[in-house]
């Protein structure tokens, strides 16, 4: 993975934060989009 570290950083997939957030680049503006994973433990999500 060390050899692919720079490419992942360009794609906004830095290995430290790739699970939590994603960087979306459109034109010259970049925005960080939260990408929640795992169990959603909110009480209102129970059915």
Swiss-Prot record:
InterPro entries assigned to the protein according to its UniProt record, in alphabetical order: SRA-like (IPR012607)
GO biological process: translation
Biased composition (Basic residues): 38-47
A Pfam match: SRA_like
Region ranges (Disordered): 23-47
Extent of Polar residues compositional bias: 23-37
Source organism superkingdom: Bacteria
Function: Although this protein associates with the 30S subunit of the ribosome it is not considered to be a bona fide ribosomal protein.
NCBIfam families documented for this protein: PRK10057.1
Subunit structure: Associates exclusively with the 30S subunit; there is 0.1 copy per ribosome in the exponential phase and 0.4 copies per ribosome in the stationary phase.
Similarity comment: Belongs to the SRA family.
The protein, known as: Stationary-phase-induced ribosome-associated protein
Source organism per UniProt: Salmonella typhimurium (strain LT2 / SGSC1412 / ATCC 700720)
Lineage, top ranks: Bacteria, Pseudomonadati, Pseudomonadota, Gammaproteobacteria, Enterobacterales
Gene field: sra
């Amino acid at each position: 993975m060390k050899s692919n570290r720079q490419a992942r950083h360009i794609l906004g997939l830095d290995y430290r934060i790739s699970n939590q957030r994603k960087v979306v680049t459109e034109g010259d503006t970049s925005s960080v989009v939260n990408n929640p994973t795992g169990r959603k433990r909110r009480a209102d999500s129970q059915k």
